[in-house]
């Protein structure tokens, strides 16, 4: 064996043997996620994003994020009729450390939807596209099932095709009238109270008795041009404040100097 110095050991071993471990969360910031004032719970959670560095602005990575929240959590209500409805909220603007969200859709939970489908009854579904007063184009899915007559001895409660067509037409008319005659805020309140489905069930009783009538899903297909002042009205006190306002953690509106921009951190 040759006797001599080990050059590798004298120089500290191989290159890149040990690197300093950096916690990735040290480069991130927490932001509060705010729901519109049509819901009782304003702060629905927090979200994480990389801190602003150079041309990578944190707010650009926050806009467009979609949050799915149960209606029971939004309304602080343990009623089981609210727990199976999920509302989708999309981040549209960032003010200070607050992510301001707007309505982006609604859906039922999978277990609720599957539990309604049973044998010996007719499923009736209607899909309607309608536009609100303030320019939101929505696709609304409505579902209902025929109900068994208590005085009947039959096991089944199937509806005739002519009755199904009449019920579907009645569903379409009611949804069109409700959506086209309201703005987005009024429509969200109707969806939270489930008033549209109750009107459909009541109106179709003369054609064929129904049960488990629900607005199953709502999709936002098109939105009007983004306006900061309208978004701040949804998150403020409704006083029509201009875009020089910021929503605080309690939902109040705070004025800031005109032309104010948050400072950009150059180093982490």
From Swiss-Prot:
Record InterPro entries = Ribosomal_eS1, Ribosomal_eS1_CS, Ribosomal_eS1_euk
Top-rank taxon: Eukaryota
List keywords of the entry alphabetically.
Cytoplasm, Developmental protein, Differentiation, Oogenesis, Ribonucleoprotein, Ribosomal protein
The record's annotation in Pfam families points to: Ribosomal_S3Ae (PF01015)
GO annotation (BP), single: oogenesis
SMART domains in the record:
Ribosomal_S3Ae
User: What is said about its interaction partners and assembly?
Assistant: Component of the small ribosomal subunit. Mature ribosomes consist of a small (40S) and a large (60S) subunit. The 40S subunit contains about 33 different proteins and 1 molecule of RNA (18S). The 60S subunit contains about 49 different proteins and 3 molecules of RNA (28S, 5.8S and 5S).
Family as reported in the entry's similarity comment: Belongs to the eukaryotic ribosomal protein eS1 family.
Q: What function is annotated for this protein?
A: Essential for oogenesis; required for late follicle cell development.
What is the name of this protein?
Small ribosomal subunit protein eS1
In the UniProt record, what gene is named as encoding this protein? RpS3A
